[in-house]
């Protein structure tokens, strides 16, 4: 959390929308154990529109995503791509195949493991025209992506596959040098059973979500102007 706090931006803040971040810590000093709570509040630039990672287009929702989700990779406070859920990212010589090895201890806030299939499902959902995601064109270099977005091919034909539980492979139609950056900024996993459980309510409030990032969202109802980010204990 220390590194994350360093990367927070406090510029261009506006009044009216307040978020609170809190975490509990246990420190041991001279053999004694001390429990304490840390919290901080800050103002966001606008209201959160959604917690659905496939439908986020505004800055406030994007800030939420950075805190409650973790993608294959992430950007550090110097905007460098560093490992997220993926421990390694490998590109083929021709640039058309990307392979990601995932951490085996990554979990959702409900205790489910984060697997390669969660990334396959999220990309299929993102590019499915039924989702109406405005992020689709970012990933149009994936095999069959244009056809899936047009509805002429099924999402299952997309060039994204889970080789095994913790190995994700992506096939591209042409080399995309910035693809690794895309995996750090616009591709978060989704727990399929949770998406299906909540249906149209998915992402409309804190309670209709599950999280795999360092924090979980609490208290956002979809319309209120304050909420909390709490430490993800998974």
Each PLM stretch: what is its role?
Residues 137-193:
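Surface-exposed binding/hinge segments that line
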Residues 36-49, 97-100, 119-122, 168-169, ...:
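Short, well-ordered beta-strand elements
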Residues 43-93:
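N-terminal lobe/hinge region of extracytoplasmic solute-binding protein
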Residues 172-234:
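Gly/Pro-rich hinge or "lid" segments in bacterial periplasmic/extracellular proteins
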Residues 20-23:
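C-terminal motif of bacterial Sec signal peptides marking the signal peptidase cleavage site
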Residues 2-10:
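Bacterial N-terminal signal peptides that target proteins for export
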Residues 87-134:
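Aromatic- and charge-enriched surface segment that lines or borders ligand/interaction sites
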Residues 25-27:
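Bacterial signal peptide processing site
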């Amino acid at each position: 959390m220390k590194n994350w706090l360093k990367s927070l931006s406090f510029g261009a803040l506006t009044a009216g929308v307040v978020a609170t971040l809190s975490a509990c810590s246990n420190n041991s000093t001279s053999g004694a154990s001390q429990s304490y709570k840390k919290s901080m509040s800050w103002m966001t630039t606008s209201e959160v529109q959604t917690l659905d990672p496939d439908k986020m287009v505004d800055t406030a929702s994007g800030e939420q995503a950075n805190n409650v989700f973790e993608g294959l990779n992430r950007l550090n406070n110097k905007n460098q791509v560093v490992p997220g859920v993926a421990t390694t990212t490998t590109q083929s010589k021709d640039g058309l195949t990307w392979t990601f090895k995932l951490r085996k201890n990554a979990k959702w806030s409900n205790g489910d493991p984060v697997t390669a299939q969660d990334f396959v499902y999220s990309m299929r959902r993102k590019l499915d025209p039924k989702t109406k995601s405005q992020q689709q064109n970012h990933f149009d270099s994936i095999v069959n992506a244009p056809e899936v977005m047009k509805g002429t091919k099924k999402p299952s034909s997309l060039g994204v596959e889970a080789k095994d539980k913790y190995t994700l492979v992506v096939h591209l139609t042409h080399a995309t040098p910035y693809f690794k950056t895309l995996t750090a900024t616009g591709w978060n996993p989704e727990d399929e059973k949770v998406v299906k459980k909540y249906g149209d309510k998915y992402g409309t409030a804190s309670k209709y979500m599950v999280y795999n990032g360092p924090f979980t969202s609490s208290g956002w109802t979809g319309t209120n102007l304050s909420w909390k980010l709490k430490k993800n204990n998974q």
